[in-house]
């Protein structure tokens, strides 16, 4: 399982993002991640392993580095997220809550079509990137 939280505001969103994502902590125990965007700094991202500690404990010391009025957070039992994508459509942060049961088959089909994957999670293709 997992859960995600996103926010866009006229003012800084870091506190809302932190508490909104923390609210989903009961939905997963492997990894947590936050990403914010500001015009001045672009994307700022942090991902932590939650297997031995709580979300709040892991991220409280990171909060000062986050800036911006748009952000997304994730609690995930599968992959390290958010991932930052740079494409012809622009740069963006993305998260998913999913379980792809045939990921190896899909990965093989896409690789045969000359696609590529950059994000790995536990030596496997990150399913968020696959989606």
For the regions a language model picked out, list residue spans one by one.
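Conserved short alpha-helical segments that host acidic/polar catalytic motifs at enzyme active sites
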Residues: 1-131
